Amino acid sequence: MEAFLKEFGDYYGYPDGPKNIQEIRDTEFKRLDKGVVYLDHAGSTLYSELQMEYIFKDFTSNVFGNPHSQSDISSATSDLIADARHQVLEYFNASPEDYSCLFTSGATAALKLVGETFPWTQDSNFLYTMENHNSVLGIREYALAQGASACAVDIEEAANQPGQLTNSGPSIKVKHRAVQMRNTSKLQKEESRGNAYNLFAFPSECNFSGLRFNLDLVKLMKENTETVLQGSPFSKSKRWMVLIDAAKGCATLPPDLSEYPADFVVLSFYKLFGYPTGLGALLVRNDAAKLLKKTYFSGGTVAASIADIDFVKRRERVEEFFEDGSASFLSIAAIRHGFKLLKSLTPSAIWMHTTSLSIYVKKKLQALRHGNGAAVCVLYGSENLELSSHKSGPTVTFNLKRPDGSWFGYLEVEKLASLSGIQLRTGCFCNPGACAKYLELSHSELRSNVEAGHICWDDNDVINGKPTGAVRVSFGYMSTFEDAKKFIDFIISSFASPPKKTGNGTVVSGRFPQLPSEDLESKESFPSHYLKSITVYPIKSCAGFSVIRWPLCRTGLLHDREWMVQGLTGEILTQKKVPEMSLIKTFIDLEEGLLSVESSRCEDKLHIRIKSDSYNPRNDEFDSHANILENRNEETRINRWFTNAIGRQCKLLRYSSSTSKDCLNRNKSPGLCRDLESNINFANEAQFLLISEESVADLNRRLEAKDEDYKRAHEKLNPHRFRPNLVISGGEPYGEDKWKTVKIGDNHFTSLGGCNRCQMINISNEAGLVKKSNEPLTTLASYRRVKGKILFGTLLRYEIDEKRQCWIGVGEEVNPDIE
């Protein structure tokens, strides 16, 4: 920390503030002492505990009323709302004579309001920077629908003094991309261009990269448009209005509207001080507000209306004209306390504090190297790391590379960060233009990715050797050096490959070396293997039952994962979402043809006949991972039982054996499913999961050696923690990794490779209580990671023998064919 303070000590920690950063953390963010490192302030910053105390003291000490009423309390509430508007305008240094503050449900609603009320004509143009949020891109739909043109642009700065006029014009240039039009027959006459209104939109700070845009764009687009747009088809267009998306940037450096008089500015208050959510604002120049065309009217926006004839007289004040319905007056009351907090620290001090942390992290990531000298990190955004430049906000966006130059998937980073208590964000952050621009993804690649099944928030982080998104960390006013340091330490320990010493003392590049252990030394021959246990899981994500002997079929173990529980919105319910599903016990009596289910939450056991008319085929369809299946809907009593057992509305579905069924994950998640050649029920990846007792024993040794507290607090892991179908005994730890095929008794299986583990194995069921921790996944991640996957256990496909009825039994010999 000494080196950090030497460089940033004058800027970090609020040295001139009422409290320094440590005092702020100790008194207002005690909840972060539980090991949470929160680095997603670009998504939402955190509320202060002191801030919330003030808010709820206000709520419990005062009475608030609907501002549309005329009582004393309602009038006082109206005055409070007016004061809040002034606070917002003051924060942006905007005069009430020039601007009005309209409260909305968020920045997105504010942008939508601009889009739907802007005076579009077929001669209008909508220009927007590539680095814009989807909520800004959505305005394009309104423009194109009215026959206007739309075009994405890139901003180029040619000099060190942005906006200054030179002999060749201003140093800022707007470079346009393809022009989009739906009315291709439209003719742009020069005289009509002069009468139409046009809109230019840009963010004060890019939420993808943290790049801060030069606010001189406001004046240049309004006063020097022809030169700035020189060479584009828009250079002759007049009457440009400017919209700034300040949702990301205003938390640390709000635009000064007295100097940069944008026509529209949008924000969300949870980005500023964490609470309230669901409240934003549109700051609109009063002269611009007069041009907006609003169709709908509502309570609060009319002076008078007549129900049975076409007559309405609207209110004239800007706020009353545009704000439909009753204002969210309690949320508006809460923002006063948030602004009080920001004012005590000052935006300039917050800017210096947060940006010093982001610059520190960027420098550390830039310098990070693998053991072979290859760079670990690729950064996106401004390369200027001077705090005084104001070129970049407190955001660091990057991707990580392996020593061989291939990419770590961003989901791997997110998974491991979560295990380390670090909360960050991955993907494209709803900013497709910036994402494509920085990742150098062409239109054909973007379309190809979509055709391959890639959509927002899915698992496809690397396609055709290129990342589809990135990793983002961002800092807020309460972030500390310790947060930044823990993040850097995490990156180094998890992704930077150190030099590795070999037995003869030479150094080579390595990654996740095996821990020294006599048990891991190679042996000349394998001891005998045998099948230790068999477990059938009739209902996906519920508890299974062990058997001594069980029949095999085309889908694996008979009735394994043949049922699943579906939520009301169509999602598959699993232990990831509902950990209590592990408490639901199951058993199948083959002779009686009964599936029995029990739960501590239900008094009676549930009995379901496996062959029964209670499964009535219906016309509705269930779409799971792009596979259309026929629903087998259970009786009302069965669905009611599962609703009580799980604690949410749901229904039980059975896989239709008459349907030719491929892997659940085909198409939607390329590469996730290993078993594309055979039929499976509701399993994720393959028919069988095999776990080795010896591998589990080695994992237990590592856990005990790593953490004495863990050893005292937890029992040794049981192989069934990993939900295997088959547990084997014998052999060496992880010997199953090398299997190509395996024969168990008289049955043949093909190895499909390792099983990719997730946080589900961190859920334990001890004495009927569901508990979550970071283990064993954290320890497995330290030595079982292979190209973004944490592998433990082996997936198998059963090579069915159609000529005979096949069974598998405990105690049978296991004979692997090793690669």
From Swiss-Prot:
List modified residues, type N6-(pyridoxal phosphate)lysine: K271
Top-rank lineage group of the source organism: Eukaryota
Please list the GO biological process terms of this entry: abscisic acid biosynthetic process; auxin-activated signaling pathway; defense response to bacterium; Mo-molybdopterin cofactor biosynthetic process; molybdenum incorporation into molybdenum-molybdopterin complex; protein import into chloroplast stroma; response to cold; response to glucose
Residues of the active site are C430
Pathway involvement of the protein, from the record: Cofactor biosynthesis; molybdopterin biosynthesis
Enzyme class label = transferase
PROSITE patterns attached to this UniProt entry? MOSC (PS51340)
Which cysteines pair up through disulfides? They are: none
MOSC domain residues:
650-817
Q: Does the keyword Transferase apply?
A: yes
What cofactor does this protein call for?
Answer: pyridoxal 5'-phosphate
**EC number, UniProt record:** 2.8.1.9
Alphabetical list of Pfam families matching this protein: Aminotran_5 (PF00266), MOSC (PF03473), MOSC_N (PF03476)
Q: Which UniProt keywords apply?
A: Molybdenum cofactor biosynthesis, Pyridoxal phosphate, Transferase
Q: How is this protein induced? A: Up-regulated in response to drought, salt or ABA treatment.
Expressed, tissue-wise, as follows: Ubiquitously expressed.
- Example GO molecular function term? molybdenum cofactor sulfurtransferase activity
Q: Which reaction does it catalyse?
A: Mo-molybdopterin + L-cysteine + AH2 = thio-Mo-molybdopterin + L-alanine + A + H2O
Q: Which InterPro entries match?
A: Aminotrans_V_dom, MoCF_Sase_C, MoCo_sulfurase, MOCOS_middle, PyrdxlP-dep_Trfase, PyrdxlP-dep_Trfase_major, PyrdxlP-dep_Trfase_small, Pyrv_Knase-like_insert_dom_sf
The job of this chain, per UniProt, is described as: Sulfurates the molybdenum cofactor. Sulfation of molybdenum is essential for xanthine dehydrogenase (XDH) and aldehyde oxidase (ADO) enzymes in which molybdenum cofactor is liganded by 1 oxygen and 1 sulfur atom in active form. Modulates cold stress- and osmotic stress-responsive gene expression by acting as key regulator of abscisic acid (ABA) biosynthesis.
Task: Describe the family membership recorded for this protein in Swiss-Prot or TrEMBL.
Answer: Belongs to the class-V pyridoxal-phosphate-dependent aminotransferase family. MOCOS subfamily.
The name on file for this protein is: Molybdenum cofactor sulfurase
Instruction: List the source organism.
Output: Arabidopsis thaliana (Mouse-ear cress)
